[in-house]
Amino acid sequence: MAETQNFDKVNILKRRSIPYDEYFGDMDLTPKQKAKRKEMAIILEDVFYIFFEMFGKGLEIGFLNELKVKQELTYQLYDAIENSKEAERFFETEEQKDKYITDTVNETYRSTVENIVREPDTLDYTGTEKYWLSGDRAQFIAENESNTLLNSAEFIEAKEEGYTHKIWMSYGDDRVRLTHQEVDGAKIPIGAYFDVGRARMLYPKDVTSELSTGAECPEEVCNCRCTVSYVK
């Protein structure tokens, strides 16, 4: 689910996204893991920007075809995910994939409408684009969703390779949420859930696993930079 939307707050002329090399580069990940996240984020950024362009054109002509723009975003997300090199590892079941895409489409549309109505004049950091339909927002969503998908893929891969435990690792700076600091260093069985604030997650940004409550707790998921180390 595009959990970034529920936590989508911005100040006028303040950049919300972070350049991919910086966003992923500072995480406790291998160079290969960082490269995969950046590659997927670039693809997803185009997907969300196409959606914003369609949305904006609908507003310009005074007719926003909800069904059409949702169908296009759905198609683009399926295409991006299914053509990824990691496609087979993003989700454990087809049902998980379908739910993730449906939730992402519905939440992206809902939040865009809601924010445009509430704050129609909010600009992006360049002062030239309406933030809610901007490249900045597309990048912000893309970097978050890429991290969500690759975290899931790495969890599934770790299980397949026989890892038995996992350790939650926070980013370690003064921006880390208190609830994430509290779970930092916790080592649990690979199939167990971390309790992070109100959220129950298998790994950082888990919004798709069967018993996860991450999708209902955007304050624990949005822009999370934590990682997990898998051990045997």
What are these regions (language model features)?
Residues 136-232:
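Acidic, glycine-rich two-metal-ion catalytic cores of nucleic acid-processing enzymes
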Residues 1-157, 161-162, 213-216, 229-232:
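N-terminal leader/targeting and assembly helices and adjacent pre-domain segments
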